[in-house]
C-alpha cells in the first residue's frame, strides 16, 4: 500500500469504523484480516462493498479499516459509512451519487434505554386486575 491515503470515520449504533483508502487493487482489510474472513455472512459482505460498487471503484482502491464496538451488522454498516465518507474526500464528484443512495447519512437509530418501573424500554410489567 502507498503512503497517500484518504480517511473517513463511519458510525452505526455503538460501532465506530476508522477507514483509510489507498490506491491499489481492491483488497479490503478489516482489523488486519481480509473482510471475507471478518464478516462471515454474504449480506454483510454486500453491505461493505456497496459504496465501492456504486461508484465503480471496486478493483481500484485498497481499503484498510479499524472497527470496534457493536455487533457484526453495526460494524459492517459503520465500515460502509466510513468508506463512503472517505470516497467523498477522494473525489467530491461522487458525493451526489453516495448521498442519493443514503450512504453519507449517519443512521441515528440507537437502542432505547430501559426505564425503571418497567420490564424494558416500552414493555410494562404484567398487570394483575385481582
Swiss-Prot record:
InterPro entries according to UniProt: Ribosomal_Su5_D2-typ_SF, Ribosomal_uS9, Ribosomal_uS9_bac/plastid, Ribosomal_uS9_CS, Ribsml_uS5_D2-typ_fold_subgr
Listed SUPFAM superfamilies: Ribosomal protein S5 domain 2-like
PROSITE patterns, alphabetized: RIBOSOMAL_S9
Keywords, sorted A to Z: Ribonucleoprotein, Ribosomal protein
UniProt entry tagged with the keyword Ribosomal protein: yes
One GO CC term, this protein: cytosolic small ribosomal subunit
Region (Disordered): 108-130
S-S bridge residues: none
Entry GO MF terms: RNA binding; structural constituent of ribosome
Gene Ontology biological process terms, A to Z: translation
Pfam families recorded: Ribosomal_S9
Statement: the UniProt record of this protein carries the keyword tRNA processing: no
Family: Belongs to the universal ribosomal protein uS9 family.
Record-given protein name: Small ribosomal subunit protein uS9
Gene from which this protein is expressed: rpsI
Amino acid at each position: 500500500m502507498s503512503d497517500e491515503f484518504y480517511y473517513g470515520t463511519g458510525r452505526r449504533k455503538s460501532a465506530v469504523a476508522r477507514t483509510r483508502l489507498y490506491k491499489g487493487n481492491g483488497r479490503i482489510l478489516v482489523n488486519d484480516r481480509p473482510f471475507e474472513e471478518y464478516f462471515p455472512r454474504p449480506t454483510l459482505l454486500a453491505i461493505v462493498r456497496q459504496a465501492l460498487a456504486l461508484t465503480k471503484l471496486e478493483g481500484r482502491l485498497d481499503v484498510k479499516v479499524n472497527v470496534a464496538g457493536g455487533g457484526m451488522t453495526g460494524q459492517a454498516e459503520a465500515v460502509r459509512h466510513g468508506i463512503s465518507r472517505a470516497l467523498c474526500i477522494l473525489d467530491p464528484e461522487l458525493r451526489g451519487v453516495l448521498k442519493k443512495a443514503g450512504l453519507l447519512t449517519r443512521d441515528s437509530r440507537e437502542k432505547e434505554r430501559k426505564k425503571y418501573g418497567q420490564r424494558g424500554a416500552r414493555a410494562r410489567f404484567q398487570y394483575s386486575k385481582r
